[in-house]
Amino acid sequence: MRATHPLRLPTSCTLRRLSALATAVTLALTISSCSLREGTQSLAITSLNAQEADAAKPQDSISDMDNQPLSTASGLVTMSTSYVAGGTGSTAKEMATTVASRERSTDKFQWAVSIKPAVADQERTKYADNAQSAMSENMDRSSTGSAVVSPDGQYLSLILLPSEQQSGETAADLRTHIVVLDTKTGKTVRDVTVSGVTLGQALTNSALNVETAQNYFPAGSGKGTITIFSLTDTSAQPSSFPTDKWLVGATRENLMLAPSLLPDDCFSECSIMTTVSLLNTDGSTAGSISGVTAIHPGGWIHRFANPKAASDYQQRSKAASEDERKSLSPSREAAEEQLVNPSIKKTIDITGKRTFERGVPTGPGLLVDQKTPNGNGSTVLKPVFWLSSTDDGHPHTENLEQFENN
C-alpha cells in the first residue's frame, strides 16, 4: 500500500469538507459542491524537458501525497502534484501532476509530462466533491489503484481526478479520465473517459481494463461493468461485460476477479482467503485459483497450497483460548504457502518466508525475505530472492544487495 500524507486545504474549504464528511451519503450518491478545482477541466497533457520538469517540482505539501517511485521496463517513474494556473481567462488554481522517468542506475532524465486533471491518489480523491471520494482507499491499491504498471513494464496507466459533481447529479453522471503512457517515451498510448464510480483498473500487456459501477460496489444496485480498451489497436472500440465481482488485478493476458477485495497490506500471516477467477477480455472464464490471500502487481498471486487445511487450522486457532493458542501449531499442509504466476504456470514455495512488493530492474516485482539468525540470539530479515513479472518466473539471487535496508 502506498503511503500518503494529509492534504492541506484552505481553512474555509476544510471546514466545509469536514461538515460534509459528517453527513451520510445518500443511495443516489448526490454530492454538494466545494471543489479543489473550480469548474470542469478538460484533459491536458504537455511534454516537458528536464529543466521544466525540475521547475515543476512543487514547494507545497501536495507533493508529499504522491506515490513512491514506480519501476518500469525503462526506468523509475516519479510523480509530483502542484497547483498551477487555470485555463485561459481563469483566475482559479488547478492541480496538475508531473510524471517523470529517469534511468534506474544513473538517474538520467528520460522524459516528463504534465497532466491535468491531477492523478487521483487516496488523499486527493478523499477530499474531492464527487461520488468517487468514497472510493479513496481503492486509489492506493498497488494492483488496481490510480497508478498501475503492466506486467511487462511497458505501460503506465493513471486514473485522474474526476470533474466536480453538481448538486442533483448522481454517480452515473460522474466522468473520469484515464491516461495510458508508454514508459519508454512518455507518449500517450490511449486516453479514455469512463462514467460512474471507478472501482479500479488493471493492465494486461495489451489492454487497459477498468471497472465502474453505479454504486460503491459491483454487485446488486452497483451494476458493475468492466470495460476493455486495447493498447495494441488504439483505434478499436472498447468492449465491456457486466460483473458482480471486484477487479483485483491482472496477469499478462487475463483479468483477475474476486467476490470481495483482499487486504492490500498482507505480507505475512495472511488469513483472509478467497477464490480468484481468471477471465479473458471477452468475459469468458479462463480458470480459477483458490486459497488466495493477496494479489501483487505483475500477476503474482499469494495463496495457501492447501486452502482447506489452512482454513481448518485458522478456525481451531480462533476457537482456542489464549493459552491453548500458544501450543497450537499448523501442520505442514496448513502452513504451506505459494506464489503463483498463472501466465507462465509457475509455482514457488514461500513457506516460512515473507513477500514484499518492490520495483525490480524489469518493472513490477517481488522481494522474498526470510528470518535469519544474526549470531546475537535474535533474527533479522534477509533477502532470499526476487521475482520479475516479465521473465520465466525463476527466483533471482543476483544483486540482492540492492534490497538491503530498503
Regions found by a protein language model. Give the residues of each.
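Hydrophilic extracytoplasmic domains
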Residues: V25, L36-G39, A56-S80, H296-N406
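Sec-dependent bacterial lipoprotein signal peptides
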Residues: M1-S32
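Repeated scaffold domains used in trafficking and secretory/extracellular systems
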Residues: S61-T72, A118-D129, M139-V148, T193-S206, ...
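Short, solvent-exposed loop/turn segments at conserved positions within beta-propeller repeat blades
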Residues: S90-M95, S167-T176, Y216-G224, D264-M273, ...
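A short beta-strand motif characteristic of beta-propeller blades
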Residues: E52-S61, F109-V113, N130-E137, K187-T193, ...
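Structural core positions within WD40/WD-like beta-propeller blades
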Residues: V77-S80, V84-A85, S150, Y155-S157, ...
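Short loop/turn segments that connect beta-strands within beta-propeller blades
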Residues: R104-T106, D182-G186, S230-T234, N280-D282, ...
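N-terminal "mature head" segments of proteins
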Residues: L21-S142, V148, G377-T379, F385-N405
